[in-house]
């Protein structure tokens, strides 16, 4: 299935293991997800050129609008033949890539996310979701980033901050688990909204009564190898808080500004 040009519609995978080719496509939605992947499906998204998917909304909304929703038990493989190919994904009340959150009460768990050989920009404009990962009280499966360039922009307000990659929260409770994140041979730029959250890992708030420690937390079993993580505070930040370089064994060297 190949999509190109501009359109206002969602792509819903009913079953099976399809390959979706995004060839210089611009797909927007006002509700639901630009691409919806069910449990049991392994869906491959082949990226060609410069592509944008998801919501154009910039305000809070009462229905989730996501870029790519992959249900628990499902797998999405986002790939291309090189990092000159770009996918830009936007979500509100939903991760740009991952889970979604409905009416402040209902969370949908996310499955596994594999990003390889591609450049991805992921944005969420609501702190109930990480840019890549979980939304609300939902969980997310394993996030693999391999031979890729990723920019992940978490959201927030003056009291709360979501990580670029990781978990989120709802109005009832803090999530006590984060996705397993495995990064190799990649360049990751992660933007937290303010200093309360992790860069990768947990959401946080001004009370400090959360699991966030302002760190790169890849979860139990996660790792970073042969990769560089650029850490920013503020969605418009142009200067890093720190740059952490990981060698082939996962040993970090941190350079702070």
Whereabouts are the PLM-identified features?
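A composition-driven surface/loop motif
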Residues: 1-257
């Amino acid at each position: 299935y190949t999509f190109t040009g501009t359109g206002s519609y969602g792509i819903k995978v009913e079953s099976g293991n399809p390959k979706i080719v995004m060839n210089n496509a611009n797909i927007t939605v006002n509700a639901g997800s630009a691409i919806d992947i069910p449990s049991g499906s392994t869906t491959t998204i082949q990226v060609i050129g410069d592509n944008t998917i998801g919501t154009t909304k910039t305000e809070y909304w009462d229905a989730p609008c996501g870029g790519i929703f992959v249900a628990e038990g499902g797998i999405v493989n986002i790939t291309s033949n090189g990092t000159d190919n770009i996918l830009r994904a936007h979500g509100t009340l939903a991760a740009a890539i991952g889970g979604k959150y409905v009416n402040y009460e209902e969370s949908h768990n996310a499955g596994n996310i594999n990003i390889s050989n591609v450049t991805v920009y992921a944005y969420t404009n609501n702190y109930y979701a990480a840019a890549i990962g979980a939304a609300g009280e939902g969980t997310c499966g394993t996030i693999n980033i391999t031979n890729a360039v990723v920019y992940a922009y978490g959201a927030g307000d003056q009291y709360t901050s979501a990580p670029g990659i990781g978990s989120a929260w709802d109005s009832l409770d803090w999530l006590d688990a984060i996705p397993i994140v495995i990064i190799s041979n990649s360049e990751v730029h992660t933007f937290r909204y303010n200093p309360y959250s992790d860069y990768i890992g947990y959401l946080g708030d001004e009370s400090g009564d959360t699991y966030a420690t302002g760190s790169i937390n890849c979860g139990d079993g996660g790792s970073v190898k042969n990769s560089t993580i650029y850490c920013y505070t503020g969605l418009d930040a142009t200067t890093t808080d720190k740059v952490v370089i990981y060698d082939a064994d996962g040993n970090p060297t941190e350079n702070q500004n």
